[in-house]
Every structure is written in C-alpha cells, then in structure tokens.
A protein has these predicted regions:
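Substrate-binding/catalytic lobe of Class I Rossmann-like enzymes that use SAM or dcSAM, i.e.
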Residues: 185-237
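Conserved class I S-adenosyl-L-methionine
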Residues: 152-192, 203-209
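A short glycine-rich, Lys/Arg-flanked "PGG" loop and its adjoining helix->strand segment in the class I
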Residues: 135-147
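A short hydrophobic/small-residue beta-strand
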Residues: 86, 151-152
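Conserved N-terminal segment of class I S-adenosyl-L-methionine
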Residues: 1-114, 125, 237, 265-266, ...
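A short SAM/SAH-binding and catalytic strip from SAM-dependent methyltransferases
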Residues: 121-133
Length: 282
C-alpha cells in the first residue's frame, strides 16, 4: 500500500491510534530485530561508518553525551574511548538492563524517567525514521542539548537517497508479485505493479522537488502488515537531510557538517544515508 503523507496532514486521532500499534510492536519486536540492526555496529570504520566516526570524534574529555533512542548502545564504547560519559535512553527495560551489564560505566534510563538535565552532545543514530512525531523528536534532541552544545543525527535519506525503503509494500498486502499471481490474487498483483512503476517514482520526484520541512509519513509499514522483518521494514517516517537541517537552522543552530559537506564519503554510504551535525546557540 503506497500511501505517504506529510506529517502536518495527519489527523491527531489517526496518529494516536497508530502510535498504540507501533508501541505494541516495539514492546515485543521480532527476535531478529536488534541482530539485524547491530550487524554493522561492532566496529566503526571510516569506510563503512564515516558519519559515526565523525560524530564520535566530537566527544571531548569529560563530555556528557546522550543518545536518545540508544538501542544496544553501540556508540557507547567510542564515546568512552574519547573520554566522554555516555548516557542512553530507550523504552525497553530488558534492553537497558543488558546495556548496563555490557557498559557498566555508562548511565541508562527508561524513556520518561530521566532527570531534567542537558548534555554537551546529543546523538540520534537511525532512530528518527522510527518515530511517529519527527518534529517532536527533534525538539526532544534540542531540549536535551545544553546551550552551545552539539546535536548529531544520522539516519537514512529516504527522499534524496536511492530507492524506496522496505517498509513500503505494494498492492493490498506484502509479498512478491509471483506469489500473488500464483495464489490468484490478481487485483493485488495489478495494483502492486501500478504502485511500483508509476506511483512510487512520481512520489519520489515530487518529494525531491518541494521545499524542506515536509516530514513524509508511512502509517502502513510492512512489518505491521505481517511481513517478515527486514531492516527498516518498520520505518514510519521517511527522513530527508534537508528537512532535519532546515528544522535546526530555523531555531538558530549553526550547521557544522552534513553528509553533503564532508569530504571523501564512500558512494555506497552517501547514496542511502545522511548526517547533520548542528551547534545550538550559546
């Protein structure tokens, strides 16, 4: 079902109902969820994770670093290697308890239980594509950053980057055209082809042509429709680097670096990913 809408076009009741569905999904994610997410996280290298390396290098001795939506906290050892003090926030207490065992010097809080503090560096690594209120999430990053501090966001670029994310499914149900035809679901297969070859390219062209600040949303991710989990199969927000940078600039931030300004980024990284590093006014 290819139906993407700007965030500001969503009805509050519709968004609230969807938030309940996605929250239930994250309370009991597929067993493969964090395994897939962590496959490339064991060792940051400039060739594979140039944005992660650049973000980690912003840490200084004694810096207080917060990752909002920390997952398994694979940023933590790189922060600590630079002399920083890592703090992570997420929803799952079981996940956080595992993090505490893995990284005993770090501090972990369940979302909503953290004290009202600010941090020198606030990081978001592949989280904003999973949130139902992207502007609200950016505001959280902003509010947790101290005056003069730095905010770093790394995520896919589903608008200016290549391809369409896997959370999109075509037709009336997830699955391949071949299986739809084999099972006699002809209308599903026909709609699949129409959306794949006509609707999706037109959306991509339109989304790239408009001004920043749209925050495209997908309230029908394939993971919630029963498809076996793939990376970004649960993506509900389609990030765009210029959306994020524009949001920061409108609040007076200085953009220190982006995926477009850093030099020597490998093509296989830049074609799918983006990065914004912004300095909050002092």
């Amino acid at each position: 079902m290819f139906r993407l809408r700007p965030f500001h076009c969503l009805e509050p009741a519709e968004l609230a109902a969807f938030e309940l569905r996605i929250a239930a999904y994250y309370k009991s994610p597929p067993e493969s969820y964090y395994f897939i997410a962590n496959q490339a996280a064991n060792q940051y290298t400039p060739e594979q994770q140039p944005f992660h390396c650049h973000l980690a290098s912003q840490t200084f001795e004694g810096a207080r670093v917060l990752e909002l939506g920390c997952g398994t906290a694979h940023l933590c050892p790189y922060v600590e290697a630079h002399g920083g003090i890592y703090h992570g926030i997420d929803y799952s207490e079981a996940l956080l308890e595992g993090n505490r065992r893995a990284f005993p010097r770090a501090v972990f809080w369940k979302m909503g239980s953290q004290p009202q503090e600010t941090f020198d560096l606030v990081a978001s690594l592949y989280t904003i594509e999973h949130v139902t209120d992207p502007p609200g999430y950016l505001q959280q990053l902003w509010d947790n950053c101290c005056p003069g501090g730095v905010i770093g966001v790394i995520c896919p670029d589903f608008v200016d980057g290549d391809g369409i994310p896997r959370s999109i499914y075509y037709g009336t149900s997830p699955g391949r055209i071949r299986s739809k035809l084999a099972s006699g679901r002809l209308w599903d297969a026909m709609l699949h082809l129409f959306e794949l070859f006509f609707i999706a390219p037109r959306w991509k062209s339109h989304a790239r042509s408009i001004s920043p600040g749209t925050f495209w949303m997908n309230l029908h991710p394939s993971d919630l429709a029963g498809q076996e989990h793939e990376i970004d199969g649960d993506a509900v927000h389609f990030p765009r680097m210029t959306d994020i940078a524009d949001w920061m600039k409108k609040r007076g931030a200085k953009i220190l670096a982006t995926s477009r300004t850093l030099q020597n980024i490998p093509p296989h990284v830049i074609k799918h990913n983006c990065y914004v590093l912004a300095k909050k006014p002092a």
